[in-house]
Amino acid sequence: MSSTDIWISNDASTFQKAQLPTQLRHVKVIKIREDSIGRIILLISTEITNEENADPDLSEIFISDSQGLKFSPVEWTPNHQFGNFRLTFPDFLKGTIFGSFHPSIDYSNHQVNYTENIAGGETKISVDNGLTWSNLKVVDEENADSFGCDITRPERCSLQGYFYNLKLSNPSAGIILMTGSVGDDNEFDRKDRKTFISRDGGLTWRVAHNSSGLYATGDLGNIIVYIPSPSYKDGDVQSKLYFSLDQGRTWNQYELVDALFYIHPLELINTTPDGSGSKFILSGHLITTASQEGNNTNISYIARSVLYAIDFSAAF
């Protein structure tokens, strides 16, 4: 297979061939981004190939010089041969990038086992526009014993976000929430997902809730609203909303529905795009259960859609 070239134009008219650190074969450019100082970031992901004697490259991140013509690899190379990168650039934290790598699964192998466990990836943070990267350090003495590794060794025990949903909370003054698990980069159990909070722009993290769910911030991070996702497998239905008025240090709860229903949340947003407001919208479905005649099991069904307006204007 011939190599792939990258062409750059600074005037939308003439193009120059980019200088790459290696030839690109069996790869695809997932996304092209610009950092906060104008450099180009390329996400290069390796494709699985059946060609004999193929020598595929590792998935990499390339970052350009100030002219956008000469690219160098980022010093972050996961120990996987195939995989995909995803980068998240918080608009409210200039220079900060969250990166998540997830190894590819070869579906041609019919021996693949589908379990609650998922192949481990790597999640890292850069605060200098991608020049250097570090693991997401967990600083949470209260919950340290609940993790399967030693959080005092962040190089081997750190917060790992989920590649398909590296979702950060709304804009705030360094207050970020993220769903993930704590471990190394080997394997993660979906049932271990928790919601974590950082108050320093993503450098250190601690547990906010022992479940995954929807979250949004308001008043630039002083207000946090959280509603857990229901766990139907364990019979853990959801009817409560949690909120914090002190950046997630303490939490209160509010009963959304009566005992006849529980809620399946779909979306939770702050009505102010810049995250400064104190009003939120929660949408979802009200779920109820009923037993069928001649059937000992209960059947769940949607009673109706529901929309909540949540206002903390009078909270301060």
Swiss-Prot record:
BNR repeats: 62-73, 124-135, 196-207, 242-253
Keywords from the named record: Repeat
Entry keyword annotation includes Metal-binding: no
Entry GO CC: membrane
One Pfam family cited in the UniProt record for this chain: Sortilin-Vps10
PANTHER family to which the protein is assigned, alphabetical: SORTILIN RELATED (PTHR12106), SORTILIN-RELATED RECEPTOR (PTHR12106:SF27)
Protein name in UniProt: Uncharacterized protein YCR100C
